[in-house]
Amino acid sequence: MFHGIKKSDVKELTEEEKAKNELQLKKLKAIQDQILKIRDKNTYEQKSMEFLLKSSVLMPDYPTLWTIRKILIEQHLPNLKDEEAMEFLIKEIKSILPIMMKNPKSYLLWYHRIWCLVKCIEIEIKKGTELEKSVLIGEIGLCNKFFLKDDRNFHCWNYRVKILSLISIYFQSTFQKFVKEELEFTIEKVTVNFSNFSAWLYRSKLIPIYFVQHNIKWNTKEALDFFKDDLELIKKAIYTDPKDQSPWNYLSWIITNFSPMYIKSINLDENNLLIIKYSNVFKIESLLEIFGEEKNYKLLNKEEFSSEIKIQLNNSENWGEEKIIIQNKNIDKVKIGFDGLSLVTNKICFTKENLSLPTITISKSKEGKLIYNIEMNNVKDFQLEFLQKQLDEINELIKLSPDFFIENGHVHLAELYKIFYQIRRRNADLKEKAEEDKKNEIAQLKLLQEKSKRMNNMYSTILKIEETDN
């Protein structure tokens, strides 16, 4: 299975086919030997370049071939004037297109194309000029042609993300319009094919950029309204084929972004290392302001973003006199960058207007027992309404098609149950309802558990939530 799509069965080769493969293998071995000779000679020659290009038709996924070709190109470029170098690279890009059309899922071919394109940009930067916009837009058009053959080609989708990154840097004035058009394009693709995992994923990369451009804050009513059509489309996709994991994954992404942050676990080991695990990633750097001067504890986190806090507690008989109070002081931070050939990077740090980081008061008694109190703030009515609606719709799907759901949707239901239970347990006005709902939810899980062993993990996960509270 790959993104919910079954792979074709591999049939056994006949003796004639095996013999043919042996001959082909000998031919490829001879070509490989010649390629290694070119590598050892390490000198740019036109005949060597022609041989490598011809060989790539038979060996498109041979890494050494493309590495040598890049080395020779880099040797040759300094000998050319800027205009000549640009012409050389454009010719190189065009020369590999027929090979790409025959091998549309070759990592190395797509990488070589973007490598050449970046070289073109480097020349333009050196000249103090800009690459023509039509070149990058033309690459988007190329992707569209490949999608006509296979709209799920994730190599092509990854390439499109890289082109998006280049456009964001070099054509900022039109980038906002381009993002809007790309969002419309993703809707077209997933509407035609609900199983288009890459289209859903690409959409999830575009939306954070769109929100920044239009000053839309996550976890607000305005942000949720943006997803109105998306949620209807997801519902249609899931009801069409509950086994398809693509819309499920996109739904999980939306739910995560509109769910209050909660604490998954708090553990203190024998070495006095305290680890607090949260349900979402947040910015560690902002915690330094909260901890301030070190007293009986030390914050160990070194990374910029994490979903857990690591604190080393010092041995002290009077530790119970000290308290660690962790509260939300994060600020929004979105990075849209291009570093070499990396993809567009979107890192969103959650705020109290965004996701609620629970306030924790932690202390340690003289007997060494860990004592803590958790309070979840800033849970909004529209959040609860949204999550409740998703829960109701999934429960409705269980009634209509329990067998399909058990095999595909149980993880998402478990996540929703966990979120709801944590919200209710942390809010005084919802605590009473929490116990009643938990009984109903566990009853639902037991019913599903009888139908499939795969429900065991889900059932035990829900029951273990109470360990966080005690």
Report the location of each language-model feature.
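A conserved position within tetratricopeptide repeats
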Residues: 2, 39-42, 52-60, 73, ...
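Structured C-terminal portions of repeat-based eukaryotic scaffold domains
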Residues: 208-470
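Residue-level recognition of tetratricopeptide repeat
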Residues: 48, 62, 105-106, 152-153, ...
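Extreme N-terminal leader/anchor segments
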Residues: 1-64, 71-81, 85-90
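Eukaryote-skewed repeat-based solenoidal scaffolds used as protein-protein interaction platforms
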Residues: 93-103, 110-241
